[in-house]
Amino acid sequence: MSANQQSNSQEVLGEVLGPLSDNERLKRESNLLRGTIEQDLQDRITGGFTADNFQLIRFHGMYQQDDRDIRNERAKQKLEPLHNVMLRARMPGGIITPKQWLAIDKFATEHSLYGSIRLTTRQTFQFHGVLKPNIKLMHQTLNSIGIDSIATAGDVNRNVLCTTNPVESELHQEAYEWAKKISEHLLPKTRAYAEIWLDGEKVESTEEDEPILGKNYLPRKFKTTVVIPPQNDVDVHANDLNFVAIADNGKLVGFNVLVGGGLAMTHCDTSTYPRRADDFGFIPLEKTLDVAAAVVTTQRDWGNRSNRKNAKTKYTLDRVGSDVFKAEVEKRAGVKFEQSRPYEFTERGDRIGWVEGIDGKHHLALFIENGRLLDFPGKPLKTGVAEIAKIHKGDFRMTANQNLIVAGVPKSQKAKIEKIAREHGLMDDGVSEQRKNSMACVAFPTCPLAMAEAERFLPQFVTDVEGILEKHGIPEEDNIILRVTGCPNGCGRAMLAEIGLVGKAPGRYNLHLGGNRGGTRVPKMCKENITDKQILEEIDQLVARWAAEREEGEAFGDFTIRAGIIQEVFVSKRDFHA
């Protein structure tokens, strides 16, 4: 932290960025993320957290929320909103054992308002609707089965994603181990989590407690992935730091490093935009943790702490220059990036159904619409997964597409597990490829940032899109990558879709077109603030043209660019709002 930063303003490379945001004060005064959270837990007058603690609990993996469906009714009754928390677990690579699954299933059933488990685009699970009296129990339950929620939210490195590829089992295992190492290396070192939630022994904090993150932590959230081409299921360009696995004869030899991706933006603020990550080059395995720390510390020191809307790594690269940032990383890591090794992303969806791995084990990928595991009428999905967990000897793998893989199934167990899955609606041969390639964030009723529906909106919207595709004779395999996010923060990753809807107001969305199937192109806004009916009319007209004018094998997103319907985004800062 520079002297100017200490005096409540920030200067980076000679440029004064301005006074520090209030979040910087909050973190600096938090006593390494402790704040007064413990005192707040004892306050039963309110179901929420007050003042700074509302923000600080994010570093412990929680967001304060309320049920927005009943907010107005409670206000009429002179009641405060139904405050509760959403917890996001830390699960690098998304692997969870059957024993762990049964424990989280039990907690969700007995101690959450909604009784559901939500698989998320961060390749983990979320509990929604946990009331204040149950929060400590929640953390202690997770701790008893070897799970925590440290740093899954807040201005830190979040849950590390890893390609869910059980077919290439040896390579996946190597990549997964690196995802875990990176996660551990970049974790906050403060003991605040154990002290508050696990009744751990209190220790005196020291200046050296956060050697990588610093006492003010990062300027903004930071997301990391480990990805195994040709699968881009983690959507590398949605993340700050990506390690692209490079293999030789099936053995991992190093990584290409991609830095500066991110999708969040702010409506009507042209200084914000989604951005693809830059390719810095190749590194050998032994430099992985050094490079991870160097990227994080460079962003820690150079990221914008004055304006949180411009605080992410993508804006730092555009402000100081990608080459300058890269050179600083090389200096800090003691490495010289080599020329990137060749790789290609050809797909990013999950292979739903059974696949056989090279080790002879079988893996069943279950499509979970929007990641919501709940016992719906006629489709007791949550019970079905629990029943599988009772007999399964392998593990479960949550995917960044919000699906669930039953991994490591011996041939002798296949029929039994499939029977359970079908009986509980977890396997349905009638689910279209279009539905499998559509995704939404949570949005209403629990997300406080949601401007429009997403999860509850998507199922019927997909049905309508399916009808349009059928009407124009589009084959099943030529579906469209379709994503909906309830606000411009981008949790639904709509800014890497062929058709992306971004919530603007209740019942209204911005329509973005021009992404591609591999997730390597940012779509651009086509129509602003339109209704779902208007969106479907637009899609109908576009699909009609696509069906009539497409080149052989041409995907929808590629067609919209070639046909001049939308301009391609090459450089986001220049092109996205042009």
Curated annotation (Swiss-Prot):
Listed EC numbers: 1.8.1.2
Keywords: 4Fe-4S, Amino-acid biosynthesis, Cysteine biosynthesis, Heme, Iron, Iron-sulfur, Metal-binding, NADP, Oxidoreductase
Positions with a binding annotation for siroheme: 491
Name of the top EC class for this enzyme: oxidoreductase
Disulphide bond pairs: none
Keyword Transmembrane recorded: no
GO cellular component, one term: sulfite reductase complex (NADPH)
One term of GO molecular function: metal ion binding
Residues that hold [4Fe-4S] cluster according to the record: 441, 447, 487, 491
Stored InterPro entries: CysI (IPR011786), NiRdtase/SiRdtase_haem-b_fer (IPR005117), Nit/Sulf_reduc_fer-like_dom_sf (IPR036136), NO2/SO3_Rdtase_4Fe4S_dom (IPR006067), NO2/SO3_Rdtase_4Fe4S_prot (IPR045169), NO2/SO3_Rdtase_4Fe4S_sf (IPR045854), NO2/SO3_Rdtase_FeS/sirohaem_BS (IPR006066)
Heme found in the keyword field: yes
Cofactor binding notes: Binds 1 siroheme per subunit.
Comp. bias (Polar residues): 1-11
Cofactor(s) needed for function: siroheme; [4Fe-4S] cluster
Region of interest: Disordered: 1-20
Catalytic activity: hydrogen sulfide + 3 NADP(+) + 3 H2O = sulfite + 3 NADPH + 4 H(+)
Pathway terms, separated by semicolons: Sulfur metabolism; hydrogen sulfide biosynthesis; hydrogen sulfide from sulfite (NADPH route): step 1/1
Biological role: Component of the sulfite reductase complex that catalyzes the 6-electron reduction of sulfite to sulfide. This is one of several activities required for the biosynthesis of L-cysteine from sulfate.
Assembly behavior: Alpha(8)-beta(8). The alpha component is a flavoprotein, the beta component is a hemoprotein.
Membership in a protein family: Belongs to the nitrite and sulfite reductase 4Fe-4S domain family.
PANTHER family to which the protein is assigned, alphabetical: SULFITE REDUCTASE [NADPH] SUBUNIT BETA, SULFITE REDUCTASE [NADPH] SUBUNIT BETA-RELATED
Protein known as: Sulfite reductase [NADPH] hemoprotein beta-component
Lineage, opening ranks: Bacteria, Pseudomonadati, Pseudomonadota, Gammaproteobacteria, Vibrionales
Gene it is expressed from: cysI
